[in-house]
Amino acid sequence: MSNMFTIKKMRDDQTINFAADELKKYLWTMMPKSGNTPISLEPGATDGFRLGLLEDFGLENEATDATWDDVVHIDTTTQGGILAGSNPRSVLFAVYRFLKLNGCRFLFPGFDGEYIPRKVVTGQKYHKMADLRLRGHTTEGDPSLEQALQYIDYQTKQEM
């Protein structure tokens, strides 16, 4: 059962590229038999998991300022669908929200804080604009570089 999924990016953007890599990594962790999921740049694609901005799919963007306001849109089946956002950061948030809706948990920073179930992904529908434009935490003390990077990764998975 190899290449069960495909990931298609609607545009070439550093953050969307990272979102595609993260989706590929976690799909493989959840379903090792799904094989090596190919990632490609295919604007206008209509199959596979499609990552892009809301406008790439003709979806309305209710954000006042798309650069600062995060809108996440998910409309998937078991074989793929749309993971979109108001900006590239929101596309990454859409990937993490999709994974959480499928049972993944990011409990605390670092690999040990992740719970990734072994299961087939299910279709999801979700659309939300963030309640607050600015979200996050602060760190106190003197974290190491490794701790700081793990914290940044964790906060992104919490859509902050």
Map each language-model feature to its residues:
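Feature activates predominantly on carbohydrate-active enzymes
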Residues: 10-22, 26, 65-160
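Cell-envelope and extracellular/periplasmic
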Residues: 1-12
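N-terminal segment of the mature soluble domain
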Residues: 21-40
